[in-house]
């Protein structure tokens, strides 16, 4: 299965039990910042934004004072799982990033999708990739 198929079929799909509700944007990005696959709507990000995200995984709390920036959008960092998941909020939407052995699984949402639904979609794929040694 191609990385693009993972994005299209497992991240940008309808949310279980909520037909028509789906993430706004999603991507799978290598730890080095290289994009493995992304939705057409995923924002173009700067290398320093991805560096900041990777630093926060290695040093939890790094982004808390400044916020998480991706594609020029600033998200307020909310409770995640140290070293495993970073969650951010901006208005009625937000972002979830799950770290696997080799990649970051990213999902961005807006209402009517809820933070919990975004977490479920992103973390389910991230957990699967971890199980596969990726």
Curated annotation (Swiss-Prot):
Keywords for this protein: Actin-binding, Allergen, Cytoplasm, Cytoskeleton, Disulfide bond, Phosphoprotein
Main location as per UniProt: cytoplasm
GO MF: actin monomer binding
Cystine pairs: 13-118
GO cellular component, one term: cell cortex
Motif (Involved in PIP2 interaction): 84-100
Compartments (UniProt record): Cytoplasm, Cytoskeleton
Post-translational modification: Phosphorylated by MAP kinases.
Entries under Pfam families matching the protein: Profilin
Keyword Lipid biosynthesis part of the UniProt annotation: no
Keyword check for Disulfide bond: yes
Sites bearing Phosphothreonine, chain numbering: 114
Its job: Binds to actin and affects the structure of the cytoskeleton. At high concentrations, profilin prevents the polymerization of actin, whereas it enhances it at low concentrations.
Self-association and partners: Occurs in many kinds of cells as a complex with monomeric actin in a 1:1 ratio.
Miscellaneous notes: The variability of the residues taking part of IgE-binding epitopes might be responsible of the difference in cross-reactivity among olive pollen cultivars, and between distantly related pollen species, leading to a variable range of allergy reactions among atopic patients.
Protein family: Belongs to the profilin family.
Protein name: Profilin-3
Protein source organism: Olea europaea
Organism classification: Eukaryota, Viridiplantae, Streptophyta, Embryophyta, Tracheophyta
């Amino acid at each position: 299965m191609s990385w693009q198929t993972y994005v299209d079929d497992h991240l940008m799909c309808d949310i279980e039990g909520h037909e028509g509700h789906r993430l706004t944007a999603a991507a799978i990005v290598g730890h080095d910042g290289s994009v493995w696959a992304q939705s057409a709507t995923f924002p173009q990000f700067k290398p320093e934004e991805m560096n900041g995200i990777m630093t926060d995984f290695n040093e939890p709390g790094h982004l808390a004072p400044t916020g998480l920036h991706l594609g020029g959008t600033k998200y307020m960092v909310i409770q995640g799982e140290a070293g495993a998941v970073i969650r951010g909020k901006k208005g009625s939407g937000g972002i979830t990033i799950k770290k696997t052995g080799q990649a970051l699984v990213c999902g961005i949402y807006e209402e009517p999708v809820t933070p919990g639904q975004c977490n479920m979609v992103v973390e389910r794929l991230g957990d699967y990739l971890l199980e596969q040694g990726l």
